[in-house]
Amino acid sequence: MLGWILYQKDTLQDSYENTRFLEEAKLLQITLKVVHPPDFGWVLGGDFPLLYKGKAISLPDFVIPRLGAMTDTLTWNLLHFFHLKGVRLFNSLSLIRLAQNKLDCLFQLASLGIPVPKTTALHLVESTYSIQRVFDFPLVVKNNVGTHGEGIILCTSDQILEDLMPILLEQTNQNFIVQEYVDTRPGEDIRIVLTQNTVLGTMKRIAGRDQWKSNFTLGGKVEPYPWDDSLDSIASKIQKNLTFDLLGIDLLMTESGYVVNEINSAPGFKGMELALKNNMARLILEQCIEFVPG
């Protein structure tokens, strides 16, 4: 069986995950390679071979896209090509696109009755006065497309927001959202990793010293977190209503319960393996083996 990990060149964020995938693939007798979207050439409408670094190459049995929010137009085109040719993608195109857009994702979750933080699009509230009518300080401003805790700003006062607004509104090629800052458990969140049918793991992420973002990639700590009925209800709704192979869910803890902050179509699992001492790479690859046709 041949599989590819589709990954961005010169990016180290998921180097741990890629290494673990390659280690476990060898033990499972899967031929697995890390490949990069810009190195491919393809043509629609005809019997043309797929090219990789200028040479014809056979299609794999499956592809694991690991770009998440960094999935650009070039990569989208390549993923559509793979889909057209019958290559099994882990995840689906629809799930990758949904997870890439934070606001669309929150709309989808809210429509399922899943609690989400109070959120709006920045262009709908183009003055600090409008924001102050709805949100208390501190509040969070996020790039609508972002990953690994990047593009997130904590505004602690109306003056900081007022200074920031002109800069953000000039970024015509980017969209931003405004979100309440959930301070019930500051610097902490819950990460769930699950498949369509199974919960693979749950952990708490705790921000590092002088940090307010809990991402493990930013130096945060991780520890196991017990499963409970509220988490089960949220996970079950997502599993029943979204189609996916692998999903990371990030939740914040409020006084009234959990709220889902965002989802991730290519969740990192270094922290999960460290906290739970489980083999996430193997569990994910076993899903690939199970669902690849033939």
Regions from the PLM with identified roles:
Residues 31, 88, 115, 138, ...:
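Residue-level detector of anion-binding/catalytic polar loops
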Residues 68-70, 144-146, 266:
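Short glycine-rich anion-binding loops that position phosphate/pyrophosphate groups of nucleotides
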Residues 150, 154-242:
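Phosphate-binding site of ATP-dependent enzymes
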Residues 2-22, 57-58, 82-86, 94-182, ...:
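Active-site nucleotide/adenylate-binding loops and adjacent lid/helix of ATP-dependent enzymes
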Residues 230, 240-244, 253-294:
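C-terminal active-site "lid" helix and adjoining low-complexity regulatory extension at the edge
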Residues 1-90:
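ATP-binding N-terminal substructure of ATP-dependent carboxylate-amine bond-forming enzymes
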Residues 249-251:
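Hydrophobic residue at the +6 position relative to the catalytic HRD Asp in the kinase catalytic loop
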Residues 139, 200-201, 247, 259-261:
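Protein kinase-like catalytic core scaffold
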